[in-house]
Amino acid sequence: LTRIGESVRVESRLYMSELINQKTTIFDEQVSRKPNKYPWTEKFIEAMHNGFWTDKEFSFKSDYHEFKTQLTDQEREIIIRTLSAIGQIEVAVKSFWAKVGENLPHPSIADLGYVMANVEVIHNNAYERLLSVLDMEDVFEENLKLEWIQGRVKYLKKYTHRFYKDSRKQYLYALILFTLFVENVSLFSQFYIINWFARNKNVLKDTDQQVCYTRNEENLHALAGCQIINTIREELPELFDDELEDKILKEAGEAFLAESKIIDWMANGINEKGLSALILKEFVKNRINESLAMIGFKNVCEVDEEILEETMWFEEELIGNNMTDFFKARPTEYAKKSQHYDEDDLF
């Protein structure tokens, strides 16, 4: 009996040692808040807290006047379609981040998800109010019925479709689709258009600043999503097989086709320096390729670098670290809402 008891104790110690040393992943629940296995989440949370804003900061009064008096009929239609397309995504698609902690049950990951979800609520409210102030609500509702708008919603909601029995791989698939195409691609042609009008026509300054805030935060969300994806790759490389990459690359091609239809509609025939349907399509192709590269996948789009060169001003603004005071149009040294955070800032 003594030998048996000793044997049981030895086996128990070995079993407990195995449990302690057993590799855990981001999919395994962590009940206690400490230690924080993913301290990089704190940098993203801090960046979003430092950039807090609300739509109440803007009156849009001058924008309304400029919209009615300083734009041509063609330009007004472009703005209407562009803001409708932004509002469609912000209002109809964004609910993903609030549930990230249910699938990746770590306190720090859940916190990050809640903070990003709160930012999406701010975006939702901001664009609802902007559409109201500019008296576009009826047009917005009508535009949502258009075939190419519905097609975009359909492809952007593919992340909700189940393709894998393995719950971890299914969530990874959904996370990749949402991060790459909802956060890092779908809204950026619209951001580009609004920023272009403010830059080249000197109009819609409040709208432009709201778009800058949104643009920088969507970029930050994409960086956070890619960090989560790359963490999964480090911990569970077997999930990243050829079949998954092929599926994502196919979805990327479909994303470009859907976005191209939206671009043709939004651009409304405009052909000016730095702004045309052709330029916007090359811009979106490049964002798709960059998104894929951020998670270690190969490119899927052939990009005309000469045309893309005309969009470099947007990229320079996006990666700039200083806030631009849009009343004085000069760099300022304090950190606030429109400050961009890139990988070097965060890690």
Give the ranges of each region predicted by the language model.
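Non-heme di-metal
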Residues: 15-347
